[in-house]
């Protein structure tokens, strides 16, 4: 009695095709993820460097305004002519705001480092964007009011009979104007970190 055997033909192309397709899909996914991670890491490093520059600019702006005291060489028996940042609440607000901004940027550096270590994490980037926007509103309010007072100190106001004082207090006006100018540099530096994140969000 003969043994009967059954043969099943399995196409060789099907298994090889499936084996060939699987690695290709995996390689494509890994390549896309690595490319996106590298792009985000580069933006995070750029953001970190800009924050360091913003710390320097904000600190120098606050220090320049804080040391803007000037006393005129002449005085009377009852009066001494002196000008300082603490004589004007607007300049006090500027110094306090710049100090708070410097402290905030220092505290935001660890979050910026997290975005470098984990470039694909969206939560730290979103948190920085929200906080940066709030701080930008504070700094804009402080600088715009300080710039307005500095303009009046330089040019005066004929309608209200406010006389310009910069002809007498030259050093005081130079330092206050320098503080406002440094703020413009700090604003530009501090505004840029949010731009890469917004452009990245628009792409998605």
Swiss-Prot record:
Record flagged with keyword Cell wall biogenesis/degradation: yes
One Pfam entry name: CASP_dom
Its membrane topology: Multi-pass membrane protein
Keyword line: Cell membrane, Cell wall biogenesis/degradation, Membrane, Transmembrane, Transmembrane helix
Gene Ontology CC: plasma membrane
Extracellular side: 63-92, 147-204
Taxonomy, superkingdom: Eukaryota
Subcellular location as annotated: Cell membrane
GO biological process, one term: cell wall organization
Disulfide bonds: none
TM segment ranges: 42-62, 93-113, 126-146
Chief localization: membrane
InterPro entries: CASP/CASPL (IPR006459), CASP_dom (IPR006702), CASPL (IPR044173)
Cytoplasmic side stretches: 1-41, 114-125
Family membership: Belongs to the Casparian strip membrane proteins (CASP) family.
Assembly and binders: Homodimer and heterodimers.
Its biological purpose: Regulates membrane-cell wall junctions and localized cell wall deposition. Required for establishment of the Casparian strip membrane domain (CSD) and the subsequent formation of Casparian strips, a cell wall modification of the root endodermis that determines an apoplastic barrier between the intraorganismal apoplasm and the extraorganismal apoplasm and prevents lateral diffusion.
Name of the protein: Casparian strip membrane protein 3
Species, as recorded: Raphanus sativus (Radish)
């Amino acid at each position: 009695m003969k043994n009967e055997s059954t043969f099943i033909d399995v196409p060789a192309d099907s298994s090889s095709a499936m084996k060939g397709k699987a690695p290709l899909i995996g390689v494509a996914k890994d390549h896309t993820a690595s490319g996106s991670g590298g792009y985000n890491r580069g933006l995070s490093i750029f953001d970190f460097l800009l924050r360091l520059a913003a710390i320097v600019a904000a600190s120098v702006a606050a220090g320049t305004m804080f040391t803007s005291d000037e006393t005129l060489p002449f005085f009377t028996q009852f009066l001494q002519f002196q000008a300082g940042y603490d004589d004007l609440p607007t300049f006090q607000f500027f110094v306090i705001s710049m100090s708070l901004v410097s402290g905030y940027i220092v505290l935001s550096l660890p979050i910026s480092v997290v975005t470098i270590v984990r470039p694909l994490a969206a939560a730290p980037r979103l948190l920085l964007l929200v906080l940066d926007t709030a701080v930008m509103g504070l700094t804009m309010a402080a600088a715009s009011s300080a710039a307005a007072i500095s303009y009046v100190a330089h040019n005066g106001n004929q309608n209200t009979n406010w006389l310009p004082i910069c002809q007498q207090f030259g050093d005081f006006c130079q330092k206050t104007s320098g503080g406002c100018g440094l703020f413009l540099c700090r604003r530009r530096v501090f505004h840029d970190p949010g731009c890469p994140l917004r452009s990245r969000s628009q792409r998605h």
